[in-house]
Every structure is written in C-alpha cells, then in structure tokens.
C-alpha cells in the first residue's frame, strides 16, 4: 500500500511570520513522530502597481508600489493520527494562508 503524504503550502506577505509558522508546523510534526521534508522556499511573487502622483496632470510623475507574496512548501511523510490531530489544533499567526492536500 502506498504511504500517505500531507503537502502543506504556506503563503504570506511577511516572510518572518511565514518562517515562524513553518517552524511551528515542523516542530509539531516531528514531535508526533512524522518525517518532514522541507521547508522548500518557492518563488516569491512580486506584484507592482504604478499610479499617477497627481490626480489631474503631470503624467511623467508616477509612484510605484509592490507587494511580495512569499511561499513555502512542506511535505509530511507517513503522518500518524496524532500528527493530523496536532496540525488541526495548531493556531498559526494571522496573515498566513495554509493549503493542505492529502
């Protein structure tokens, strides 16, 4: 029978909060006896927005803003039922998007 894997994909705008959440997930999984692969840093998505500084004229004067979406990937190999329960009860920081695939 093929072993069950849990793939966790994390996204956040702040890389420090993302790394802290990743460390919490890894320590929880290792404490319950599962093997963890990762965290694997995925490419950062950079969105740039250009707007006019003035509402009426002066097209040459513009301002640029950017938002960076940082991503990490974790694989939990052979999770135990205790691992799944611990991950469900885990309270991560606000601002971190978590996608879990079995």
UniProtKB/Swiss-Prot annotation:
InterPro entries: Ribosomal_uS10, Ribosomal_uS10_CS, Ribosomal_uS10_dom, Ribosomal_uS10_dom_sf. GO terms for biological process: translation. Pfam families: Ribosomal_S10. GO terms for cellular component: ribonucleoprotein complex; ribosome. Keywords: Ribonucleoprotein, Ribosomal protein. One of its GO terms (molecular function) is structural constituent of ribosome. The keyword Ribonucleoprotein applies. Part of the 30S ribosomal subunit. Belongs to the universal ribosomal protein uS10 family. Involved in the binding of tRNA to the ribosomes. This is Small ribosomal subunit protein uS10. The lineage of its organism: Bacteria, Pseudomonadati, Pseudomonadota, Alphaproteobacteria, Rhodospirillales. The gene is rpsJ.
């Amino acid at each position: 029978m093929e072993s069950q894997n849990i793939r966790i994909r994390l996204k956040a705008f702040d890389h420090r909060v993302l790394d802290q959440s990743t460390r919490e997930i890894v320590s929880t999984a290792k404490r319950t006896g599962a093997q963890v692969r990762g965290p694997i840093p995925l490419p950062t998505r950079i969105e740039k927005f250009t707007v006019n500084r003035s509402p009426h004229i002066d097209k040459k004067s513009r301002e640029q803003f950017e938002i960076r979406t940082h991503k990490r990937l974790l694989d939990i190999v052979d999770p135990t039922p205790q691992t799944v329960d611990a991950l469900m009860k885990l309270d991560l920081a606000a601002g971190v998007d978590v996608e879990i695939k079995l």
